[in-house]
Amino acid sequence: MIEIELPYPPSVNHYYRHVGSRTLISREGRLYRNRVCAILRAEGVHPLDGCLILEVELYPPDARRRDLDNTQKCLWDALAHGRAYWDDVQIKDLHAYMREPLAPHGMAIIRIRQK
């Protein structure tokens, strides 16, 4: 099982950008992905195999209204890029919770275990 605290993820609207017909990861998205990779490396996380259960507790940085699902894809991609697992298709069960704001930057608590 992996349990780790990560920075609060950017929304999918800020994670990707469109250039012509192409969709790219934005500068903000690359910075977030790199931070997640560095945290996973520092914690010695190795990729999990097989079907996975992902639990996410999101603590936003402020009290603005946010959609629970607006951060998930960028979080999943950053975790896969940082090798918490091989690919986000491994996630078969997802439990996501939006908690009370945690100023000034918010955070995400992630738990990943094999099914």
Question: What is the role of each PLM region?
Answer:
Residues 1-115:
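Acidic, proline/glycine-enriched N-terminal capping motif
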